[in-house]
From Swiss-Prot:
Gene name of the encoded protein: CLHC1
Name of this chain's protein: Clathrin heavy chain linker domain-containing protein 1
Positions of transmembrane segments: none
UniProt cross-references to InterPro entries, sorted A to Z: ARM-type_fold, Clathrin_H-chain_linker, CLHC1, TSNAXIP1_N
Coiled coil: 174-232
Record keywords: Coiled coil
Length: 586
């Protein structure tokens, strides 16, 4: 049979086995089912269709055996081709977006410029309107001020025409000649008053200038008086030396010159120093007018109070000569004024001026005024002023002042630390070391507490236990019961534990026992050996407390150490008759 004949013979389709046929039908059904489940037609999203056919391709590869490697290679190329298409689409989408952005930039720039022009025009309109409104407001203010001035000028002195004219009867007020004569009298009186104002009176500003000048002159006078006293004292000493030298020269100069000086000095003392001073001061012109000046100063102060010039009055009183107005009476004057709405408290103004000028006087502000000033500042919520007064000015502190600041700190918790620091300064200045150290404890400054205790060594055990009652802190107790620089402890640990449990501070005591329990028996033994204040009976009480609160090991350690100490007997060096081996032979 030729080749041509073979090619002309009809080619039969391959015979498909039953299993392959069922597999192909199942794949066809799977494709139809998944496509319908997506709800899209044939032109739907390519990604979903790609997933469906990829799954079918995988199942076909799993089903066949002879062509599995070929189909796997085809599928790999197919997946790579699909991924390349997706990547190209994403790149095209990004480039399309950038292209649209670049195309829209000129338009956006035009819109922004247009919007800028619109906003600038709107700002100019608003500024013009604002300037018009401001000019209208200024005009209204000017018109109102002019109206008020006119009202004061014309309405204040207006009188009811129906009322009778003072100094004229009803018939005279109806007579034109009498009215003309009375008007002439009033005009003459007005001219006289106006002339008197020009001659007899000066402006109030001139009065204040004179007051300031007088204050400066009074200060200069005080300086001159101090210098004058020093010169008088020097003159008196030179006079004594001169008289002694004259007497010594007239004598035979056998006696020492020092004896003549002492004799002349005793003679002067018998005559009286006050008489010498008065003799030397009798020509002082300021002494005669001192009482008059002080009286004028007090009158001026009262005048300022009556005029309501409380700030000037406060400065005037604070700078008064010889401190005549720096007293409780002046304080009561300001206190009687009370509060004025919209203005500072006059009493606070007085204390401000009083404390600020405290350095200008030899003596500091007394304790009573200091206490009242601190109370006034705290009542007005001016802790800043009180801080400045206490730290910068010359005041006389007292225990009451520190207590007032502490009480204020308890009410104002935000400023409690500042108040405790101020109170500690005051207590330290007054020598109230117990209260000063309590303030340090409340601030949590344990190291400063220990430094304070070492500096002032007059703290007894009762004082320290009282401190623990007021401020039970674990860190403080540990520092007090610890040796510092090989020195004896400030407080007994055992006494501290017993004291805490006796004053219902059980929690603090338990925490201390927990801390000491962590150190083991060596720490307990070291603590007991170095504790010379607590007796054996006291340590037995501590052991009982430990046992009652669940610290059995610590209790046993304490009792063991007590037994070991009881077995040791100290032999003095003087007792030579003691035989250490005596018990062996008996």
């Amino acid at each position: 049979m030729s080749v041509h004949q073979i090619r002309k013979r009809a080619v039969l389709p391959p015979i498909i086995c039953r299993s392959d046929k069922e597999f192909l039908e199942s794949m066809q059904r799977y494709i139809i089912t998944e496509t319908e489940r997506l709800g899209y037609n044939e032109e739907g999203p390519a990604d979903e269709y790609y997933i469906i056919y990829r799954n079918v391709f995988d199942k076909v590869i799993e089903h066949v055996t002879a062509y599995k490697s070929i189909l796997t290679s085809i599928k790999k190329e197919y997946d790579a081709f699909i991924e390349t298409i997706k990547k190209g689409r994403r790149t095209a989408f990004c480039l399309h977006g950038k292209l649209k952005g670049l195309a829209a930039e000129p338009t956006a720039l035009v819109y922004h410029r247009k919007r800028t022009i619109q906003l600038e025009a709107k700002m100019r309109i608003i500024e013009n309107n604002s300037s018009k409104i401001q000019s209208q407001i200024d005009q209204i203010k000017q018109s109102r001020a002019a109206y008020d001035t006119k009202e004061v000028k014309y309405c204040t002195f207006s009188k009811d025409p129906s009322k009778p004219i003072p100094g004229m009867t009803l018939q005279e007020s109806m007579n034109l000649d009498a009215l003309t004569k009375y008007m002439k009298h009033l005009e003459d009186k007005y001219a006289e008053i106006k002339q008197a104002m020009l001659i007899k009176y000066v402006p109030a500003q001139r009065k204040s200038d004179l007051d300031e000048e007088m204050i400066v002159l009074l200060k200069r006078r005080d300086v001159a008086e101090n210098l004058n006293r020093k010169l008088q004292f020097c003159h008196q000493r030179l006079q004594i030396i001169s008289q002694a030298l004259t007497s010594w020269v007239k004598s035979d100069m056998s006696s020492p010159f020092q004896d003549f000086v002492e004799q002349i000095q005793k003679t002067k003392y018998l005559q009286g120093d006050q008489g010498i001073v008065e003799e030397l001061m009798e020509d002082d012109p300021h002494r005669a007018k001192e009482a008059e000046i002080m009286l004028h100063y007090i009158e001026r102060f009262n005048e300022l109070i009556s005029l309501g010039e409380y700030e000037k009055a406060a400065c005037y009183a604070a700078n008064s000569p010889r401190r005549i107005l720096r007293n409780i009476g002046t304080m009561n004057t300001f206190k009687a004024v009370g509060k004025i709405r919209g203005k500072p408290l006059p009493l606070l103004l007085f204390f401000e001026a009083l404390f600020i000028t405290s350095h200008a006087f030899r003596c500091p502000v007394d304790a009573a005024l200091t206490l009242e000033g601190i109370k006034c500042g705290l009542s007005e919520k001016r802790l800043d002023l009180v801080i400045n007064w206490v730290t910068q000015q010359r005041l006389t502190f007292s225990e009451e002042a520190g207590d007032v600041i502490c009480d204020y700190g308890e009410q104002d918790t935000y400023n409690k630390a500042k108040c405790l620091a101020l109170a500690q300064i005051i207590y330290s200045e007054c020598g109230l070391h117990k209260k000063a150290i309590l303030c340090l404890c409340k601030q949590g400054q344990t190291h400063r507490v220990m430094e304070y205790i070492q500096q002032f060594k007059d703290f007894t055990t009762d004082d320290l236990l009282q401190l623990l009652m007021s401020c039970p802190q674990i860190e403080l107790i540990q520092c007090l019961t610890k040796e510092l620089n090989e020195k004896q402890t400030s407080l007994s640990f055992g006494l501290a534990i017993l004291h805490l449990f006796s004053i219902d501070k059980k929690k603090i005591g338990i925490k201390l026992l927990q801390e000491i329990n962590k150190g083991g028996i060596d720490a307990v033994e070291s603590l007991m050996i170095n504790d010379s204040f607590c007796s054996t009976e006291r340590w037995q009480e501590v052991a009982n407390i430990c046992s009652q609160n669940g610290f059995d090991k610590l209790s046993n350690d304490i009792m063991s150490i007590l037994r070991s100490q009881a077995a040791v007997t100290e032999i003095s060096e003087e007792d030579d008759a003691v035989n250490l081996m005596e018990h062996v032979f008996w």
